[in-house]
Amino acid sequence: MKTTNRSGHYYTNSLWFSTAYLTLTLSSRNLLQILIAELKYKSVKSKDGARKIWTNNGEVSCTEAEFKLWTGACSSTYLKSRNQLIKHGFIKQTHRGGTHRGDRAKYEVLISANGISKADERWRDYPKKDWEHDIPKAKKQLIGRETQWKKGESGRKL
C-alpha cells in the first residue's frame, strides 16, 4: 500500500460511538483504517447531491508484512485484529488467499461510503449478534495422516 494525499474517510457518529467500534483494540482500529485507505471511490451525481461509491470494495487487502511495516506490530497482533474486525462485523473475507505466490486474502469493508446504507452494515447488530463463525480457521493437517500414531499404540520400545 502506498501512502496518498487524497482525502480521508470520516466516520459517522453512529459508527464512532457504537459498541462494536468502542470495543475494538487500537491495532484493530489501525487495520480498519488501513483497509479503508485502500478503497477507491468515484463520485456519482444524484437528486440528493454527489455520492461516493466504492469501486474496489471486496478487493482490498493488507498482508501481515504490510501491517507489521506500518504499525510495528507482530503477526499474531495482525491475526487477532483481523479476527476481531470480522467478529464485530466491520469486514468480511471474500477470498482466502495463500494458494500460490502473490495470492492475497481479500476483504470487503462493511461501512457505507456516505453512512446511508444500513442494510449491509453488520456492525450495527454487534452486541446481539457476532460473526465469529466467519473467522477463517486453519485447514486440518492432512500430511502424514497414515504415519501418525493410532489409538492404543505408543512409540515406546520395550
What is each residue range found by the language model?
Residues 35-38, 85, 147:
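A broadly tuned preference for mixed-charge, low-complexity surface segments
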Residues 1-64, 114, 125, 157-158:
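Short recognition helix of helix-turn-helix/winged-helix DNA-binding domains
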Residues 1-3, 115-158:
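Charged low-complexity intrinsically disordered patches
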